[in-house]
Regions:
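Cysteine-centered iron-sulfur cluster-binding motifs in ferredoxin-type domains/subunits
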Residues: 304-320
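The feature marks the mature, well-folded catalytic cores of soluble enzymes
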Residues: 1-305
Length: 320
C-alpha cells in the first residue's frame, strides 16, 4: 500500500476517532516503556553507555569513506559481492537485476525499513515476483495491504481480534483470538514460503568493517531462515550502518537490545560473513550487500540533520 499525501488527513481523522486503536497503542506503549526501564536498570552507568554509543557513531562517520572501502574489501574477500546505490531507484534496479540473473520467482524478506524506504515490494510485484514478509508484524500488515505503523512493531495498531479476522479472511483458517494459535497459523504459512523461496532479502543492524560481517538482530527466527534457506541472500543497508570493530559492535549491541525490548541481547543474533563455504551444509550460495546512500552522505555533513543518522532503530526515538 502506498499512502499518498492527500490521504493522510483522512486517515488521521479516522484514527483519532478509533477508541480501540487508542487502547491498543496505549497498552503497547506502556509495555515498551516498562521493558526499557527494566533493561537499563540493570546497568551501572546507562548514561555512560549512551555516551559511548554516540562516540562509536561519531568515529564511524568521521572515518566513513575508509570504513566503507574496508567493508567492501572484506566482504569481497569472504566471497560476497558489494553494490553501491546512489539512490532508491538504483537500489531497486540492482536488486531486480539480481533477481533476474538468478531466475528468482519467490522472495522472502526479513523486517527491513530500508526496503520500505526504496519501495522494493511494489517493484517486485510489478515484475511478477512473489514477495513475502516473514516478520509476524510485517506479515500481518502485508495481508491487510497496509504500511508498517511502528519501527520495531509494524502491526502495533492491530489487536488480536483484528488479526483473527484478517487471518480467517485471507488465509481461510477458523477464527480464533488465541495468540498462540494465530502465531502457529502464521508459522505454518510462512514455513512453506521459506522452503520455496529463491531469494532472501534482509536489512542489517550493523556491518563490521574489520571482518566484512553483516549483523542482524531478531527475536522470531525468521531472519535466520531468510538468510540460510534461499540460495541467494541480498542485504540492503544504509551507509551509516558501518562500524569499524567488534568493540564498537559490543557497545551498540548492549544499547540497542536494552532500548528496543529490555533484553541483554536479542534472542537471535546472526553474524554473516559472505556466502556458505565449501563443506558447509546451510547458508546461501551467493551473498550480495547493497550499500545505499540516498542522501545520507549529504546529511552526515549537515550539522542540523546529521543526528537523524545516529538512530539505532531501537524504538527510543532519541538517538544516543
Amino acid at each position: 500500500m502506498e499512502l499518498r499525501a492527500k490521504e493522510i488527513k483522512k486517515k488521521a481523522s479516522e484514527a483519532a476517532r478509533n477508541e480501540v486503536l487508542h487502547q491498543t497503542l496505549s497498552s503497547a506503549g506502556d509495555r515498551f516503556v516498562g521493558l526499557r526501564e527494566a533493561g537499563f536498570s540493570q546497568l551501572n552507568d546507562p548514561d555512560g553507555l549512551r555516551i559511548r554509543g554516540r562516540q562509536v557513531k561519531e568515529r564511524s562517520f568521521a572515518n566513513l569513506p575508509r570504513l566503507l572501502r574496508l567493508l567492501e574489501k572484506k566482504v569481497t574477500d569472504a566471497g560476497g559481492v558489494v553494490h553501491w546505490a546512489e539512490d532508491a531507484s538504483e537500489a531497486r534496479s540492482i536488486i531486480l537485476d539480481l533477481a533476474g540473473r538468478y531466475g528468482v520467482k519467490s522472495v522472502v524478506k526479513g523486517k527491513s525499513m530500508m526496503t520500505e524506504e526504496i519501495g522494493l515490494n511494489r517493484a517486485f510485484s510489478r515484475k511478477g515476483i512473489e514477495v513475502w514478509e516473514t516478520d509476524l508484524g510485517e506479515f500481518i500488515v502485508q495481508l491487510a495491504d497496509e504500511i508498517p505503523s511502528h519501527i520495531i512493531a509494524p502491526a502495533i495498531h492491530k489487536n488480536k481480534e483484528e488479526v483473527a479476522r484478517l487471518f480467517s479472511e485471507k488465509l481461510g483458517v477458523p477464527y480464533t483470538v488465541n495468540p498462540e494459535e494465530l502465531t502457529m497459523v502464521a508459522r505454518r504459512t510462512l514455513r512453506e514460503k521459506f522452503l520455496g523461496a529463491d531469494m532472501g532479502i534482509t536489512g542489517g543492524n550493523m556491518a563490521v568493517a574489520e571482518t566484512g560481517t553483516l549483523v542482524l538482530f531478531e527475536n522470531e527466527g525468521n531472519i535466520r531462515m531468510a538468510t540460510s534457506l534461499p540460495r541467494v541472500h541480498v542485504a540492503l543497508i544504509g551507509i551509516e550502518k558501518v562500524v569499524e570493530s567488534w568493540d564498537d559492535f559490543g557497545v551498540l549491541l548492549t544499547l540497542l537490545s536494552r532500548s528496543a525490548a529490555g533484553q541483554k541481547m536479542p534472542t537471535y543474533l546472526s553474524l554473516i560473513t559472505g556466502p556458505s563455504k565449501p563443506g558447509e551444509h546451510d547458508g546461501p550460495e551467493a551473498f550480495h550487500l547493497v550499500l545505499l546512500d540516498n542522501g545520507r552522505s549529504r546529511i552526515i555533513g549537515d550539522e542540523v540533520f546529521r543526528d537523524s543518522l545516529f538512530c539505532l532503530r531501537c524504538n527510543l526515538k532519541q538517538p544516543p
